[in-house]
């Protein structure tokens, strides 16, 4: 399959998943904090850590699978630009500390999620 088409299919699925999670989070958790962006960034970090660890250590993801899942799906599912603008808006609307909580939370929890994803991939492989 054409590599551009693989990226486009993955991106369409990732963007729709991101949108649905954003709507769900806004309805369920409220609009006082960018919960949707936080959730997709953490989940995306976890899945990326899992896929890249499993894909390089055991499964050997094909170039096509990486284009579809990593570049396409996760590239459109997670977002840095929304995170930056939402952090700026939080600073303006709710103060510096709320904004810093968002910045620190996305970075620290995202990193932790990537580490946990990698650990899960190793566990799935039987490598502990």
Residue ranges of predicted features:
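Membrane-interface helix-loop junctions in multi-pass transporters/channels
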Residues: 1-128
């Amino acid at each position: 399959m054409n590599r551009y088409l693989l990226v486009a299919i993955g991106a369409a699925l990732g963007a729709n998943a991101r949108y649905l999670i954003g709507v769900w989070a806004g309805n369920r958790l409220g609009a006082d904090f960018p919960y949707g962006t936080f959730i997709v960034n953490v989940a995306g970090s976890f899945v990326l850590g899992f896929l890249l660890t499993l894909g390089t250590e055991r499964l050997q993801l094909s170039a096509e699978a990486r284009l579809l899942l990593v570049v396409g799906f996760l590239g459109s599912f997670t977002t840095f630009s929304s995170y930056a603008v939402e952090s700026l808006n939080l600073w303006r609307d709710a103060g510096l500390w709320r904004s810093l909580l968002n910045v620190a939370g996305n970075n620290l929890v995202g990193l932790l999620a990537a580490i946990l994803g990698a650990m899960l991939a190793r566990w799935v492989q039987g490598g502990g």
